[in-house]
Amino acid sequence: MIERRQFISAVAGGTAGYTLSMPALAQSRVDMNIVSSWPRDFPGFGTSAQRHAARITELSEGRIVTTYYAAGERVGPFDVFDEVASGNSQAYNSADYYWKGKHPAFVYFTSVPFGMTNLEWNAWVGVKGGQDLWDEVAAPFGIKSIPCGATGSQMGGWFNKEINSADDLKGLKMRMPGLGGDVLSKLGASPVALPPGQIYENLVAGTIDATEWAGPYNDYFMKLYEAAKYYYYPGFHEPGGSLCLGLNKSWWEGLSAIDQQIILAACKEEHARTYEDVIANNGAYLDRMVRDHGVEVRGFSNDVYDKFYEGWQAVAEETRQHSELTRRVHDTYFADLKELGGWTAIGEIGYSNQRNRLMGLGR
């Protein structure tokens, strides 16, 4: 974890042409209202957002005063984008694929079906130009988005019946946002948009037949095992989900360089922390749900996965046709995925396959 004095020293040493002095560090108070799509104390995403807001204040030694509003406390969970774009609040903590209706290219900056893992996405956004494309998509709305949380590879979802073939998806009401929901539509299912705080109650009530959320660690605290018996893997829809801090662009550009660096550092720290949390806990919580709650973990068959991919190819082409910008984002994303994924297959997956074979790991 970055200590504040170490952080200031690093910024002072690494910012060309920018001289920090004690008066510069003692600038006037900056107020920062952060609205969120997550309920207060919501395990995983909600606690991450609250921790991140507090960390910004801590790194600034109390000068950037953050006030955090959970979903529904200031605006609804899906209203945070407009709240920040209008300037009523300075930032939101959410997932940018929720704004697919505003511009479909937003989805590439959370996760897309058959897309990048979190490690690949981090390289794309951080090194290979993905952040510049993200800025280009968000700028017309008056938004600047920064990575601020990672889910890791996700499970396929919770189902109240077995999925033995693609026919079992027909008529299924499933909570799945983003382009993954569009893929389900191609297979005859009915995707449903629900904010996180309403997933459990709708699954218990039978209003929906299935839902995706994240992975075992986050899903356990949602108590989804109480509402559905079958837990399928792997998820085709979000191979590496990323959360974000969306900032009012004008407000962001009016900040000093040091204040921008403080916010960026807090985001980078939280982005890594959430990924570490899920990697550290997913295996243990999956075992707990199987052992203590009788959850049946099932793998999607190759035939079902083939249909997911067939549906995705149709959705991808439709999405590309939206605009020149969407086409450019899509084509750049998947061109870079060929390179990044090629190495993942040889390096990460090649090694882990051999390790798991020899050590008997996996299901």
Predicted regions and their residues:
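Long, well-ordered early-domain segments
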Residues: G126-G129
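N-terminal secretory/targeting leader peptides
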Residues: I2-L20, L25-W121, Q131-R363
